[in-house]
Structures are given as C-alpha cells and as structure tokens.
C-alpha cells in the first residue's frame, strides 16, 4: 500500500503539469501520450522503482521518489498565454499533491468515524482495515512531502520555476535565467535537501509534520 500511495502521488503530480499545459494550448504532453493514466508511461527507473525499492529494503521511515518529467513547452505558453500561465503550470503538481492530501484526510476522518478507529484500536484492525488505514495515512504523508519539497524555490523544483515566471511577469528575466543555469546541479540540490538532517528537518520534515497534524487533528 505504501508503494501504491507513492505512485499515485508522484504520477498524478506529473500528469497535472501536462494537463494544465494542455489547457493553455501546449500539446507536448498530449502528443507524447503523457496524459495517460497508465502508470507504465510515467515510471522513472531510478525515481519510481529503484529508490523506493531500496528504501523499502533498508526499512527507511519514509518512501520518496519521482516520475518521469512530463514534456512542457513553456516558451509556447509564455508567447500565447503569458508568464502567469507558466506559473500555474509550474504549480499544478504541487496543487494536486496538497489537494489530494486534504481529500485523503477527509476520507480518513470519515473512515475512522465509521470504523470506530482510534489510536488505541489500531492493533485490533483486520487485514483489510489495516491496509485502508495504511494507504490513507501514507497517501496524506507522501503528498504533503512532495507538495512541501516541490514548493521550495530551488532549481530544478517547481517552486523555482513558478518564482522565475512570476518575476518574468514583472519584466525581470534574471531569476528565470539563473535558475535555468543552476538546474545542471539539480541532483546535488535534491540530495542535499533530502539527506542533510538540519536542512531536511527545517525545510521538509517540520512543515510536513505541521500540515499532517493540522489535517488529522
């Protein structure tokens, strides 16, 4: 159930980038068949298979991953719809993750009430109830982590693209150009923010815990 929850979070994130771009007239994702709900179309060998598998094998406290990036022609969208449309496309994946987290939290509250579940009765659940609870809780958690992480204004994350195009709307291309140059170091940036404890705690884990508690309170 952990893997299923993660795949729904990461694949939906990418599909929403492509879908929002399509709504603004860019057919890149559509023509590449990347708006498909078939998960095979979106799997990245490292981010969708190997990394989650390794985290499971080593019993990591969390799973993390990513799907293949959806092709989007931001130049076309800027020329046809303006830079604010690119801000919307950049944040579409994050919006999906946060919206799904809220929806899953709502379903969790309803399920807990209907099943009479509380912290003391978790061990009394049958296999199917435990699978449902695991899926819901992990789904909330993974979507919050992805939403928080991708909101960071650091290339190549979505937050940097949104900030760059927002600056472009106000006639400044500096941020967009600088972020574009820094994307070559993207893997290193991701590694630093995920695996250096002080940074991951402050920028990812603490905000995620706060939102998680808020949704399930």
Model-derived features: where do they sit?
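Hydrophobic transmembrane alpha-helices and their immediate loop junctions
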Residues: 1-217
């Amino acid at each position: 159930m952990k893997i299923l929850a993660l795949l729904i979070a990461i694949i939906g994130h990418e599909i929403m980038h492509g879908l929002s771009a399509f709504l603004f007239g860019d057919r890149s994702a559509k023509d590449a068949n990347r708006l498909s709900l078939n998960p095979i179309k979106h799997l990245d060998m490292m981010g969708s298979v190997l990394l989650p598998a390794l985290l499971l094998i080593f019993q990591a406290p969390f799973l993390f991953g990513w799907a293949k990036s959806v092709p989007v022609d931001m130049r076309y969208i800027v020329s046809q719809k303006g830079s604010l449309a690119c801000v919307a496309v950049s944040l579409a994946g994050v919006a999906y993750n946060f919206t799904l987290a809220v929806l899953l939290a709502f379903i969790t509250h309803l399920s807990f009430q209907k099943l009479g579940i509380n912290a003391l009765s978790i061990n009394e659940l049958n296999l199917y109830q435990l699978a449902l609870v695991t899926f819901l809780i992990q789904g909330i958690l993974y979507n919050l982590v992805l939403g928080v992480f991708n909101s960071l204004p650091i290339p190549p994350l979505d937050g940097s693209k949104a900030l760059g195009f927002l600056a472009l709307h106000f006639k400044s291309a500096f941020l967009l150009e600088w972020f574009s140059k820094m994307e070559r170091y993207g893997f290193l940036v991701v590694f630093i923010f995920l695996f250096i404890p002080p940074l991951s705690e402050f920028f990812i884990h603490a905000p995620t815990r706060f939102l998680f508690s808020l949704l399930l309170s």
